[in-house]
């Protein structure tokens, strides 16, 4: 999953409507078994017809399904990637962003179903009394959910109905006949809602918990919400962001970072002609360049990955301005969390506390045998790599497995800490800073969707993340909270430090 930039194939452009059918998610997908062998370990869903099949690493029924149907695009339930069988590569496109959220929701829902004990009937009836109220209409799904609350011994029942363009809400108080009628309608609406519950809404509930996180409100409530939001920033500029950070209102800052913050440290990127890391791998005749980050390919041929690792291994690079800025935020008690895609451990070297750090794609800091899971030191792996030897498992008798740094590959799940912190942190976020990332790798990229009602700042070489599914609203007339700073992220962060008046403290951190 790390550093993969899937292509936009023709099937996601000219043939999107033919190949992608979102209605496949309307059916019950709580159990994602292969349709042919019932295996549950690693399955893909056909984005055209919704058939669930196992991967080539199990029994290969997904490939057989393609041969029989010629449906090109499938999505992974494991890592939420998309594969085009016709183009024979990983693919992605902006309209697939919301499908990533749906896949994450299904995965989270299945995991939760396995670990949560079954409640008795009385508990379920009690919970039914506090289900959040919401109505959502999308291009393919209409959802109605009822809400019943009791305030000062007075029961208020609200029922919501939706069409494709409007949402109306009616409320009846202290009228028994109307309450009974409304409750009857609510029961019917709730029943229908349970059958066709919007998967995106379920995604939010899984990440944030019921009754928490971004709220879905009626238009009148939305107007009030926007008025409240407009008080945070007078206008969406970096100068206003600096004032906001220095105010008492900003207490919990989340920073999302990508490879762009480490380029200034001398770490080469992947795709630059002649100098990019991928150029050095051409001689290994990879099936596709990103195969070096495929766990099954690694098990068969780990050498290309270790050639690449020599260019990235920690110890040869120093933190950058951005890393030390995040450290300063932590020292000032403003950093809630730093979610990073980087595997270079420069955040650790800069002194960002471990409890403030989420290495979403893992790192070189620890390593394990892919066969027996025995942990090995970074020094052991580094010594073998720089001797051009494969780091084999030596401490488990007869194992001889390959020792791999704990970097997340395709086919591997993100660290549990990623989901745990995302669920907890984004309900508290006062400010989101997104620095040096292309926002193309999911589910990391979709995190920006969950920073609701607070300022969001993009500091990047180019504008990214402006998708219609919760992305930045830089160029929209309604934008009051999203700020973009386009250019070199090191220079732009230095400018922000000056606006904040933190130059002396920053210089002291760098000096130390």
From Swiss-Prot:
Zinc finger (UBP-type): 7-110
GO molecular function: histone deacetylase activity, NAD-dependent; NAD+ binding; zinc ion binding
CDD domains assigned: SIRT1 (cd01408)
Cofactor binding, per record: Binds 1 zinc ion per subunit.
Keyword annotations: Metal-binding, NAD, Transferase, Zinc, Zinc-finger
Compositionally biased spans, kind Low complexity: 130-175
Entry-linked PANTHER family: NAD-DEPENDENT PROTEIN DEACETYLASE SIRTUIN-2, NAD-DEPENDENT PROTEIN DEACYLASE SIRTUIN-5, MITOCHONDRIAL-RELATED
Record-given protein name: NAD-dependent deacetylase sir2A
Organism in which the protein naturally occurs: Dictyostelium discoideum
Gene that this sequence comes from: sir2A
